[in-house]
Regions:
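Outer-membrane beta-barrel domain signature, strongest for Gram-negative TonB-dependent receptors
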Residues: 1-84, 90-98
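Signature of Gram-negative outer-membrane beta-barrel scaffolds
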Residues: 84-170
Length: 170
């Protein structure tokens, strides 16, 4: 859509929730569950010339939605050896939608006998791009800690992650 006489603005709406539950299975082990949800919606616009003719402007909409779940089991094998094992999952979608009218085409195109609106798209923008990224992550991890002395602790750990991503640019 044309951005002539655009009034710059920025709107942001963010939701972040997190729930952690710790369950002491016994004196030696604790199971922890961490669940989170994140949602961001942002819209903004800027005028490059800040004049009545709308010399140039952009309009951006960003959206992010993510869900994550982690389970951890931590415990002591004995007085000198402890462990941690866990699973992690995340599902995330990002959408970046932006358009730019660099020269105020909607205002000046009729002066040159040109249409101010592209009949194909219905926009007066120089360009318009929607970039969507979907990702899914799965991980398994663990560590073992050995208390060698009162002042020396040795930890070995590993993590395996698998990421799947798809990106589309329109």
């Amino acid at each position: 859509v044309g951005h002539a006489n655009l009034k710059p603005f920025e709107e942001l709406d963010t939701t972040l929730t997190r729930l952690q539950i710790d369950w002491d299975i016994n004196d030696m082990m604790t199971l922890t569950s961490v669940t989170s949800y994140f949602d961001l919606e942002e819209e903004g616009a800027a005028s490059y010339g800040y004049d009545v003719n709308g010399i140039g402007s952009n309009h951006t909409i960003n959206e992010t939605e993510a869900f994550a779940q982690e389970l951890r089991l931590a415990g002591d094998i004995n007085d000198s050896v402890s462990f941690l094992i866990g699973l992690f999952y995340q599902d995330r979608e990002l959408v970046f939608d932006t358009a730019q009218e660099a020269v105020g085409g909607a205002n000046f195109a009729p002066l040159f006998g040109l249409a101010s609106i592209d009949p194909t798209t219905g926009f007066s923008d120089d360009w318009h791009k929607v970039h969507t990224t979907d990702s899914e992550t799965r991980s398994i991890f663990g560590s073992v800690t050995f208390q060698a002395t009162d002042r020396l602790e040795i930890t070995a750990g590993a993590r395996f992650s698998e990421d799947e991503r798809s990106q589309v640019v329109d």
